[in-house]
Amino acid sequence: MNKSLRAIAALCLAAVALIPAGGTIAAAPAVSTQSDASFAVSYAAAGVTNVSATTSHVSCYAPEVTYFTALTSADGYPGGGMTPCTAATTGEQTTGFETQDVSNPAMLVKDKSESDLRVDPKNPNHIIATSKWFVSAEGYNHLLGFYESWDGGRTWPVQGHIPGYEGWTDNTDPVGAFDPWGNFYALILPYEFVYASSGGHVFNNGSKQANPSQPPEAISVAVRPAGSTTATAWITTHDGHPDHVFTSKTDNANTPDKQWIAIDTNARSAHYGRVYAMFTQFVLNPSRILVSYADARPDGTHTDWSVPQLLPSVPGKPFDTYLLPHVAPDGTVYTTTTNNPVAKGFLNNDISLVWSSDGGVTWQGPLPIVQNVQTPTYQNTTFSEGIVNSFGLGSQLVNGHYPLYVTYENEDPSGLSNVYVTGSFDAGATWTVPMRVNDNAGPTEALQPNVNVAPNGAVTIAFYDRRLPCPARGGRDYVASGVAFDPLVPDGRANYCVNTAIQFYSPTLAPLGMNVRLSLHTWDPQLNAPKRFSIAGATTFLGDYFGVDSGGGFTYTTSISTFDYAGENPNHYQQQIVARIATPAARP
């Protein structure tokens, strides 16, 4: 591969180094770095603000399946276990759900991990974010929740669990999109399991399901109509039944996962208002990637979902997943696909591009983007890696095409996870040489990148960053950080605790400044971390991704912190912090 774009950032697009689609990863050239001290103060220098969005209200719901085994403060879980609700303040329904076949008491929502955030294109002060909404971190027991702002992220007065699918053990993978009329579509994955005596998850079928009255797994929709002001204002049925795009007949084969959504809001598109729902179906070890679509209506309803159809994949390699659709202003739908074979332990990733120019009826591709991306194993802590890549699309032409961007995390030969970005300015035919995004000078990790393109064309890549050490004993942030509860004793340790960071680029991927810190406080990822597979297992969870979007001259992220900002999070649960930063001009 040729040189990093950072070395030619000041040149025009014609001079940008390009490689044919399908190049493999080579060692990236050295990049400009900044000191840890400079990164630490960049939060204040850039005028970033933080709001602890999910601690302002008390949310509760009755789970379909309860799990009362708890860890303790000595395990790093202060306030652990499932706790009965005493007083919800959200206005949400907490019991008596139509899809449930049991009558359990309402439980307190504690952790909120993995997230998505969308700015309303009709009103940039209106933002809806969604997140996993845990009643038991130890049991990995959660629905999805939402939190909504009408003042550009300063306050989040409406929040609660997303209703309609309480009859499943878990609802997962938060993602949403606004339609042209301001209705918000949440695409949801409800699924069932019961607990083994060890705390592991058991996926039964038929009468042994957690709730035999419902399909064991589904891809489903909840719509929040424009102008809604209460936590319960969601449309969750279509033609008198739950609004399922797809259902599975069994809970351990032919199972759907990794769903994503995009809506055509381009007035000159022939398919204005079309909603695209994409997901992976795992058929034992191989997988299939599918798309279904419907047309949104102004009142928050929609037409029937089309029969899910297969998307193109690499011949002979049925291991595609991670669909991330976007719609260009001309109505073309693009998505990346990520091929990571189970035979290689899901450690080798080839990223490709597929697209449709006729409203999702027919599809072209795949075109290879980058190959042999190495799935990282993060050092020092127990949380697992997420989706390795993210995909973005610009709404302003570059070189006569709408620009495409892919960012990904890669485990480099050093054993550390780093973040890279590549772009295409010819509809995916060629891609720029991958450029490292994180600018830390020391041997620390960056992970879970998420790319977004602002309305002015500026490219934003947000990611988790581990360069700053954990708060040290006796330091200003030590008590509020909760690191004293961490049995791994990370006081003052580097490449352990986490901040959220962001890097801006011009439309041609010229860097606009250096990495900016988006977290006011460094936080410990081990505290109250959900146990992904079993309470007895080592693997914990932050999420596979987190939310970033732009509008009204600002860029927003919603990401985790366990820090107790102002006494609102004394048990150090995973909470969602919304950061706001001014979006720079798109040209350097």
Spans of model-derived segments:
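C-terminal PAP-associated
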Residues: A28-P588
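Secretory targeting and sorting signals
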Residues: N2-A27
